């Protein structure tokens, strides 16, 4: 079971410190290091395949949540998020 409140807090820290990238297209063109991709449980199959291809090319980890990212990020239709801070990514993975 995932610790939803802790994961939400760490994602919130990443957003406030501008260490998060939103959306599959933005993740694909982002040039700097990404440490973790977080996907929502309601992501479509085609988008999930696209994210998996990106992750395989760049050797990234994917974490699928049991809940919606929209509730955490307060952004409408947010289903994919990348974390660019190593420590926050590690903390999110440890609480998943």
Please annotate each region the language model reported:
Residues 6-36:
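N-terminal first-folded block
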Residues 16, 24-28, 46-73:
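Positively charged, polar, low-complexity stretches
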Residues 19, 61, 80-81:
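A residue-level structural signature of the nucleotidyltransferase/glycosyltransferase Rossmann-like core
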Residues 36-39, 79:
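Short, well-ordered secondary-structure micro-motifs within conserved domains or adaptor modules
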Residues 39-40, 84:
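Small/polar loops that bind or transfer phosphate-bearing groups
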Residues 41-45:
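Glycine-rich phosphate-binding loops at beta-strand->alpha-helix junctions
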Residues 68-96:
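C-terminal structural segments of small proteins and small subunits
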């Amino acid at each position: 079971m995932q610790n939803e409140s802790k994961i939400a807090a760490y994602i919130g820290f990443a957003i406030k410190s501008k260490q998060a990238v939103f959306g599959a297209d933005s993740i694909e063109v982002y040039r700097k290091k990404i440490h973790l991709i977080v996907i929502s449980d309601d992501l479509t199959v085609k988008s999930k395949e696209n994210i998996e291809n990106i992750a395989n090319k760049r050797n990234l980890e994917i974490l699928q949540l049991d809940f919606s990212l929209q509730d955490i990020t307060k952004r409408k239709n947010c289903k994919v998020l990348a974390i660019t801070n190593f420590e926050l990514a590690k903390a999110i993975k440890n609480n998943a």
